[in-house]
Curated annotation (Swiss-Prot):
Negative results: does not block Kv11.2/KCNH6/ERG2, Kv1.1/KCNA1, Kv1.2/KCNA2, Kv1.3/KCNA3, Kv1.5/KCNA5, Kv1.6/KCNA6, Kv2.1/KCNB1, Kv3.4/KCNC4, Kv4.2/KCND2, Kv7.1/KCNQ1, Kv7.2/KCNQ2, Kv7.3/KCNQ3, Kv10.1/EAG1/KCNH1 and Kv12.3/ELK1/KCNH4. Weakly inhibits Kv1.4 KCNA4 (27%). Does not inhibit Nav1.7/SCN9A and insect DmNav1 and BgNav1. Disulfide bonds join 4-37, 6-30, 20-38. This is Kappa-actitoxin-Ael2a. Belongs to the sea anemone type 3 (BDS) potassium channel toxin family. Peptide with both antimicrobial and neurotoxin activities. This toxin acts both on ERG potassium channels and sodium channels. It potently and reversibly inhibits human Kv11.1/KCNH2/ERG1 (IC(50)=34 nM), rat Kv11.1/KCNH2/ERG1 and Kv11.3/KCNH7/ERG3 voltage-gated potassium channels in a similar potency. It acts as a gating-modifier toxin that shifts the voltage-dependence of ERG activation in the positive direction and suppresses its current amplitudes elicited by strong depolarizing pulses.
Length: 42
C-alpha cells in the first residue's frame, strides 16, 4: 500500500474508505485525502 502520515506517525493509506480493515491489527488512524491513513504499518 501507499504510505501516509498521521502527524509524524507513518501509516498505510487506504483509498475510498473511512474505516481501517479490522483484521490487520491497526491501532489508530486519521482522515486522509479521499480515504483514511491507518497505523502502525504492518
Amino acid at each position: 500500500g501507499t504510505t501516509c502520515y498521521c502527524g509524524k506517525t507513518i501509516g498505510i493509506y487506504w483509498f475510498g474508505t473511512k474505516t481501517c480493515p479490522s483484521n490487520r491489527g491497526y491501532t489508530g488512524s486519521c482522515g486522509y485525502f479521499l480515504g483514511i491513513c491507518c497505523y502502525p504499518v504492518d
